[in-house]
Amino acid sequence: MNKKVIIIGSAWPLRAGGLATFNERLAKQFIQEGFDTSIYTFSLQYPNFLFPGSTQLSNEPAPAHLKIKACINSINPLNWVKVGNELRKLKPDYIVVRFWMPFFGPCLGTILKLVNRNKFTQIICIADNVIPHEKRMGDTLLTKYFFSSIHRFVTMSEKVNQDLKTFTQKPSINIVHPIYDNFGDIISKEEARKHLALPVNEKIILFLSLIHI
């Protein structure tokens, strides 16, 4: 029987972004490696007052060949208990959970505490951030609550790994973020510039960040 992996984090039908794209690609890789894989994502990820956009939902079709269950409500404790008990009884071999901001500490931490009662499932956290970019009162408590249920950690930058060690000495590994291979074939710089109507030989600065006003 194939080992069972459940990924907890953003995925379709939520709007595509870095986390959702990563989780869906990770699920496909687990499937290719022979694991029985599914994703548990959010039925409600952010309350509206925390979400600046017009919609949190994708208008794209569901990813092919992926089992995705949108069932986690980030602000409903009764839902956390329901999902946690469901996963506890399901007894997956591994849960891979994403952590990127303390807001999700109570929700995901409670779910995982219930899962841990089966004394079987290994819980691995991919920590995108440990210390949030915009700090708020209570962040440390929420982060510690979540981390208390994790068995092992994966980080994708040395700085995040260092931040992690200020919270816990549980096993961790730092792995460079993989290059995505699901956005089409790589093209040359010359082709890309022609497509974007940019000068082929000029020096161009590409700015990838946010500007706070």
Task: Please tell me what each predicted stretch does.
Residues 10-15, 28-89, 160-161, 165:
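N-terminal strand-loop element at the rim of the active site
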